[in-house]
Amino acid sequence: MKKRLNIGLVGLGCVGSAVAKILQENQEIIKDRAGVGIGIKKAVVRDVKKHKGYPFEISNDLESLIEDEEIDIVVELMGGVEAPYLLAKKTLAKQKAFVTANKAMLAYHRYELEQTAKNTPIGFEASVCGGIPIIKALKDGLSANHILSFKGILNGTSNYILSQMFKNQASFKDALKDAQHLGYAELNPEFDIKGIDAAHKLLILASLAYGIDAKLEEILIEGIEKIEPDDMEFAKEFGYSIKLLGIAKKHPDCIELRVHPSMIKNECMLSKVDGVMNAISVIGDKVGETLYYGAGAGGEPTASAVISDIIEIARKKSSLMLGFETPQKLPLKPKEEIQCAYYARLLVSDEKGVFSQISAILAQNDISLNNVLQKEILHSNKAKILFSTHTTNEKSMLNALKELENLQSVLDTPKMIRLEN
């Protein structure tokens, strides 16, 4: 047996440098748990001059790292989609183990990688929710269960913004600026606030839970950029919080996948998850509900997950990457057939008969009201009507909102949030 496993590290940014630091600082406990010493032999970066003082070779020659016969595991922390995918294929072709934190690459290429890998280990614990061991939970801890559903706060940036809006009555714009100032949001935060990042993670988790090869364009994705303080006020009034959730549900003949802002009851454990923290609730048919909570991003939490994969590979606990021999054939539930309760916000003319018109359209679409708030806008002839419904289907709700928008008394496009009870 080898006395040391050599790592080839691609990328020395926030996570890459944290991997190097932890491997050095915790080398004894890592060796005890892995049963072998683990160290970085070589790292590849774009600009060698920016990375000084490391006790291993640093170059910009990626091919030499792949070809180095002394390197046992390649760890990819470079970002992007196609370049990391090409690196993964070349690494696996050399029968070297591959570890990645790259959720976008896995969202698009996870099944191709599993087919390429054959019996060569691939680790990707760090690709979803950083320091939370949700990948291992689905692959191993819950493997005796049918996963009935899971839902989670999968993006720390959006959760921080919504937490600020809920607790401090901040506008979306101000909460986003605050997140950027603190380093929680990128200068271009589109992937976070539009739900794309959470959707990438949802696809990876759905592959593990259900064995399906779903595509990004097939699932319902909505972001948080249309949420306003009025929505938060309604949520507080009726005992809800608003969170961006990734949701998966198993039906007898299909799988339901969606990412969108959701109103959830304050009794729900996920409603208590604030700031940049992540959490995922998983329901198995035998174990019941389990909850996984922790830091979803950041250098050291993500590096911790990367190193857990390296240790797993060192122990030679290789297994199927996605936990299924072959992709399962269950289709996705059509978006228009989704069933839940809804919240809507309307800007209307402040005049008699408007609410009667709204109620009539909802009734025509078999939608019944649950809670209603009406807010006058001072020094104007306008008002806001905020309401929630009982359970209905997506098609009926969208049809009703379209009809409401066509009313002369409705002054702007109606806004909608789904309720996840």
UniProtKB/Swiss-Prot annotation:
Cofactor: a metal cation
EC number: 1.1.1.3
Binding, NAD(+): 15, 34, 44, 298
Superkingdom of the organism of origin: Bacteria
This protein's pathway: Amino-acid biosynthesis; L-methionine biosynthesis via de novo pathway; L-homoserine from L-aspartate: step 3/3; Amino-acid biosynthesis; L-threonine biosynthesis; L-threonine from L-aspartate: step 3/5
Gene Ontology molecular function terms on file: homoserine dehydrogenase activity; metal ion binding; NAD+ binding; NADP binding
Sequence positions that bind NADP(+): 15, 46, 103, 183, 186, 298
Residues annotated for NADPH binding in this entry: 15, 46, 103, 298
InterPro entries: ACT-like_dom_sf (IPR045865), ACT_dom (IPR002912), Asp/hSer_DH_NAD-bd (IPR005106), HDH (IPR016204), HDH_cat (IPR001342), HDH_CS (IPR019811), NAD(P)-bd_dom_sf (IPR036291)
Gene3D superfamilies: 3.30.70.260, Dihydrodipicolinate Reductase, domain 2, NAD(P)-binding Rossmann-like Domain
Entry keyword set: Amino-acid biosynthesis, Metal-binding, Methionine biosynthesis, NAD, NADP, Oxidoreductase, Sodium, Threonine biosynthesis
Co-factor remark: A sodium ion is seen in the structure; a metal ion may subtly affect the relative position of the nucleotide-binding region to influence enzyme activity, and could increase the stability of the enzyme.
EC category: oxidoreductase
The reaction(s) this protein catalyses: L-homoserine + NADP(+) = L-aspartate 4-semialdehyde + NADPH + H(+); L-homoserine + NAD(+) = L-aspartate 4-semialdehyde + NADH + H(+)
Residues reported in the UniProt entry to bind L-homoserine: 186, 197
Active site: 201
CDD domains in UniProt: ACT_HSDH-Hom
Biological processes annotated in GO: methionine biosynthetic process; threonine biosynthetic process
Binding-site residues for Na(+), renumbered to this chain: 125, 128, 130, 132
Purpose: Catalyzes the conversion of L-aspartate-beta-semialdehyde (L-Asa) to L-homoserine (L-Hse), the third step in the biosynthesis of threonine and methionine from aspartate.
Family, similarity comment: Belongs to the homoserine dehydrogenase family.
NCBIfam families (UniProt xref): PRK06349.1
This protein's name: Homoserine dehydrogenase
Species annotation: Helicobacter pylori (strain ATCC 700392 / 26695)
